[in-house]
Amino acid sequence: MANGTDASVPLTSYEYYLDYIDLIPVDEKKLKANKHSIVIALWLSLATFVVLLFLILLYMSWSGSPQMRHSPQPQPICSWTHSFNLPLCLRRASLQTTEEPGRRAGTDQWLTQQSPSASAPGPLALP
């Protein structure tokens, strides 16, 4: 009760529940927006939210921690900064592969000399 000391005063506040209220019947043919367009709008908003979430997570993964950014590790071929510069990245990668064609072969030869398991497997013998 609102006033616990005086029991003679009636309580005048009411609680309304959705179960007790009769909702207004709606005829779907009289709606200004088609029911299919409402569903399409909901799906588009969900897809927009998912794309936005993906872009936020992608941006967060690009930024990295301050310790990773200032570490003395060698710079990768494509340093993905806050701006997306794909043509420059592809051009750098193609220049590095065309300038040093013998370097990779030397690395493969070094691997085969170091461990016999790194060599290419031969044909399998059938029983």
UniProtKB/Swiss-Prot annotation:
Cellular compartment(s): Cell membrane; Endoplasmic reticulum membrane
Keywords carried by this UniProt record: Cell membrane, Endoplasmic reticulum, Membrane, Phosphoprotein, Transmembrane, Transmembrane helix
TM spans (from-to): 38-58
Protein's UniProt keywords contain Cytoplasm: no
Highest taxon above the source species: Eukaryota
Phosphoserine found at: S94
Pfam families xrefs: MRAP
Membrane topology: Single-pass membrane protein
Tissue-specificity statement: Largely restricted to fat tissues. Predominantly expressed in mouse epididymal (white adipose tissue) and interscapular (brown adipose tissue) fat pads. Expression is weak or absent in lung, spleen, intestine, kidney, heart and skeletal muscle.
Region (Disordered) location: 97-127
GO biological process: one example: brown fat cell differentiation
GO cellular component, one term: endoplasmic reticulum membrane
Biased composition (Low complexity): 115-127
InterPro entries reported in the protein's UniProt record: MRAP
Entry's family note: Belongs to the MRAP family.
Quaternary structure, from the entry: Homodimer and heterodimer. Forms antiparallel homodimers and heterodimers with MRAP2. Interacts with MC1R, MC2R, MC3R, MC4R and MC5R.
Function noted in UniProt: Modulator of melanocortin receptors (MC1R, MC2R, MC3R, MC4R and MC5R). Acts by increasing ligand-sensitivity of melanocortin receptors and enhancing generation of cAMP by the receptors. Required both for MC2R trafficking to the cell surface of adrenal cells and for signaling in response to corticotropin (ACTH). May be involved in the intracellular trafficking pathways in adipocyte cells.
Name listed for the protein in its UniProt record: Melanocortin-2 receptor accessory protein
Species of origin: Mus musculus
